[in-house]
Amino acid sequence: MARHTPIERYRNIGISAHIDAGKTTTTERILFYTGINHKIGEVHDGAATMDWMEQEQERGITITSAATTCFWKGMENNFAEHRINIIDTPGHVDFTIEVERSMRVLDGACMVYCAVGGVQPQSETVWRQANKYKVPRLAFVNKMDRTGANFFKVVDQMKLRLKASPVPMVIPIGAEENFTGVVDLLKMKAIIWDEASQGMLFDYREIPAELLELAKEWREKMVEAAAEASEELMNKYLEEGDLTEDEIKFGIRTRTIASEIQPMYCGSAFKNKGVQRMLDAVVEFMPSPVDIPPVKGMDEDENPVVRQANDTEKFSALAFKLMTDPFVGQLTFVRVYSGVLQKGDSVYNPIRGKKERIGRIVQMHANNRQEVSEIVAGDIAACVGLKDVTTGETLCDPGAIIMLERMVFPEPVITQAVEPKTKVDQEKMGIALQRLAQEDPSFRVKTDEESGQTLIAGMGELHLEIIVDRMKREFGVEANVGKPQVAYRETIRKTVEDAEGKFVRQSGGKGQYGHVVLKIEPNEPGKGIQFIDAIKGGVVPREFIPAVEKGINEAVTSGVLAGYPVVDVKVTLHFGSYHDVDSNENAFKMAAIFGFKEGCRKAGPVILEPMMAVEVETPEDYAGNVMGDLSSRRGMVQGMEDMVGGGKAIKAEVPLSEMFGYSTTLRSMSQGRATYTMEFKHYTEAPRNVSEAIMAARAK
């Protein structure tokens, strides 16, 4: 089956925004315009009509949230048909993991900002992640019809807060209730959308006289930005003082794909204005899969391999999201980087060393779910039938193994005990939590061995609240939750050369004998537990080495100070002894546990606590109080910036344990006018008095 759309006409983009910037409306409008211009029935057999209202009544719109495909031929039907895959990204900081994994598979992103609220802390987090994956971006300033809307203020904020280089390609005509359209700086014409056709129709008009000078000034800046793309363009611009429309488009596209600039648009999705122009920009300025560097990975011998984005290469894809669907079971969303995948094919997962068969392949077209028989390079689709895949794992051709760079998921920083409201729900709760943990790698579930309680762990209070809410909504399980607890860790500061562990039971009959000598030393932060086998001359037989490692892995789950997990320790097994008859795996496992605990006690054990990056936005009058309060919570204030719209943005690092209930304090301190965001930064050694209090609390 030949591909319908050449890969050069693919655009894989994300729409990303702060919570209230109007991302959902923007996405809906995109599907609305593309849906009307492209009846799916034309391309595939069986006419598929789109009934928009029906979709809104059902909960269909959430199903489309992971990835939706639509088609666009341009606002004036002047392009060849392009296929746009839209990947949804959440706006809340507790779900940075979601943003991170969608950024990993995007080729470009459209950042939506509110014309009133501007650039907010969440927007910064998303921007940083887009920088990390070098994702080209364009910006859309939404809600131009709202009171207080100011397009140029948002341009300034992007420069100041995001260190971005926005290049407005349009400027608004009017603002607030007088917002009627935009001036297109490329064509130097006003675009006025027709209200009656919900913005499907529009007119080009002359630029209103009062805006002409402003439009010329911004056009000059746009042409200048385009000219910097190459020496050739720059010379022409310096000689002639202008560039042609095609040259400007070429310059802007080149620099956008290189992440040097961000084309900027504005409108009101709710009032059907401006979204169509932004869609044109996606086609004109966002990269196709072949415009960006090919994907890199490792083969089974850990040699670097590169896969070009075309159908003749061997198949490779990344699973970036799992969802449970009430009708088809588990959906695994994948981004295909190279090759072709047909339904019924087997794929190999190099992380787990397993082959699996693809049952069905499904693509979302706005509100239509469509089964397809194959997917090709550049596609995004959901596979049904994969049992053992989690987010961030590679799927590839079993005959040509490649392991794409894995996503690194942060360790949870907060835990809560959870129990079902009725005993009947116990089993249902277990299944629900397991499912949710599969979908979200930053959420963990475990059982506390002493109390038998089920513990859930995540990235923040809101993260866990939403998990509990989803259990109720999607699985019908009501649960009570305990008070949030901080996820402390333990580590060591000194090296112990000879930590000895012996496990001997010899009282007639078959006994037990295991003896190990370990070197225990601090490892680099973030490196985790490393086990090195340095046994010479068989003093500990080969077959018992895995048992020693198993013992170490068991021992690190509970540290010597307060029973918290131990991190960042290097353990080297370098000596030991055995008994011909009495030695067995269990004896060596126990010896390793004793040796490790003994070594840790001598190695200067310390407790680590999670530090959070906190940012508070507050009116100036309360800034002093806010800073004083953060300091009283053992916080280190790292700086204060002026916000473009007045007020101060205060950045600090504060231990998580001091931040519970902070929102209530902040509300009363600022009469409800200050807001804050918080995300995990790193673990650091807890001060002595804090460590002692933690140990005392655990000893009770």
Curated annotation (Swiss-Prot):
Q: Looking at the keywords, is Metal-binding present?
A: no
Q: Which InterPro entries match?
A: EFG_II, EFG_III, EFG_III/V, EFG_IV, EFG_V, EFG_V-like, EFTu-like_2, G_TR_CS
Provide any one GO MF term from the record.
translation elongation factor activity
Could you tell me the keywords of this UniProt record? Answer: Cytoplasm, Elongation factor, GTP-binding, Nucleotide-binding, Protein biosynthesis
GO BP term, pick one: ribosome disassembly
Q: Name one Pfam family in it.
A: GTP_EFTU_D2
A GO CC annotation recorded here is: cytoplasm
Q: Does the keyword Cytoplasm apply?
A: yes
Identify the residues that the record assigns to the tr-type G domain, covering every copy.
Answer: 8-290
Q: Which residues bind GTP?
A: 17-24, 88-92, 142-145
Q: Where in the cell is it found?
A: Cytoplasm
- Protein family per UniProt: Belongs to the TRAFAC class translation factor GTPase superfamily. Classic translation factor GTPase family. EF-G/EF-2 subfamily.
Q: Which PANTHER family match?
A: RIBOSOME-RELEASING FACTOR 2, MITOCHONDRIAL, TRANSLATION ELONGATION FACTOR G-RELATED
Q: What does this protein do?
A: Catalyzes the GTP-dependent ribosomal translocation step during translation elongation. During this step, the ribosome changes from the pre-translocational (PRE) to the post-translocational (POST) state as the newly formed A-site-bound peptidyl-tRNA and P-site-bound deacylated tRNA move to the P and E sites, respectively. Catalyzes the coordinated movement of the two tRNA molecules, the mRNA and conformational changes in the ribosome.
Which NCBIfam families does the UniProt entry name for this protein?
A: EF-G (TIGR00484), PRK12740.1-5 (NF009381), small_GTP (TIGR00231)
Q: What is this protein called?
A: Elongation factor G
* Source organism of the structure: Albidiferax ferrireducens (strain ATCC BAA-621 / DSM 15236 / T118) (Rhodoferax ferrireducens)
| Gene encoding the protein | fusA
